Amino acid sequence: MPVNGARRSDERMFMTAIDFSDVSKTYGDKAVVSALSFRVSPGECFGLLGPNGAGKSTIARMILGMTAPDAGKITVLGVPVPAQARLARKGIGVVPQFDNLEPEFTVRENLLVYSRYFGMNTRKVEAVMSSLLEFARLESKVNARVSELSGGMKRRLTLARALINDPQLLVMDEPTTGLDPHARHLIWERLRSLLTRGKTIILTTHFMEEAERLCDRLCVLEGGRSIAEGRPHDLIDELIGCEVIEIYGGDPHELESLVGPYADRIEISGETLFCYVSDPEQVRVRLRQRAGLRILQRPPNLEDVFLRLTGREMEK
């Protein structure tokens, strides 16, 4: 179930906002997406989580009808895509991975120009512009050129632009890549407010914290395939379920023989030993015998889920 209770009446007509059924896409001899199936409910934030090259951006392009699948069926807002992609896009707002704002236009001019893709007249755009700029916290920048904005401001303007047509569905491709932590948290706060208003969001990301904070459900991708799907905390509980101790500064294989008998499970990634334990104190007692180690004890997270599923850490 979505984290929010609000639902727009026009969204209730669709049992699913997005339906992928056995979708595949190949470029040359490389399978980018392989027999992928998932459904996104209206009012839900659904995440596509995976490293670069996992197929996330290709999936986003297929949702928009910009890339045709080689096999399978895609339905978006009740219509088949790409066959009726133009109709579907009337109800979609897009936040691309890289900003494509007009740098020499002002904030106001960027919104006006983009609105013309939806046949909106200037009077209608002016009527909603102040609320969009307030939402994006850009009221004081309405006449500033895009080239004068910070990276975080540009991303917030791109988000405001995506909302110009009051879409039912937002497709967001790596929306906080390249932002500093403060700017990233501000975008997350804005997205949570959209969910409380009943918007549907599909989000591609490789940020584990972003997926945990925003997504009702997510699909973990590797090599264009789904390797897990579910609620973030359900995946963490089912696949990990215990405390994690990260150990640095020694030979991980030697450390494994030292603490392995007291761990539920051990994973090694590079120079780091990940020790999954129900009783952390027993492991910490053994580690005190070794000088020069750096030790971090923490709750499990989606990074641990990915490591458990693939045997490696998420590549940024």
UniProtKB/Swiss-Prot annotation:
Keywords: ATP-binding, Cell inner membrane, Cell membrane, Membrane, Nodulation, Nucleotide-binding, Plasmid, Translocase, Transport. Residues 18-248 form the ABC transporter domain. InterPro entries: AAA+_ATPase, ABC_transporter-like_ATP-bd, ABC_transporter-like_CS, ABC_transporter_ATP-binding, ABC_transptNodI, P-loop_NTPase. It is found in: Cell inner membrane. Signal peptide: none annotated. GO terms for cellular component: plasma membrane. The complex is composed of two ATP-binding proteins (NodI) and two transmembrane proteins (NodJ). This is Nod factor export ATP-binding protein I.
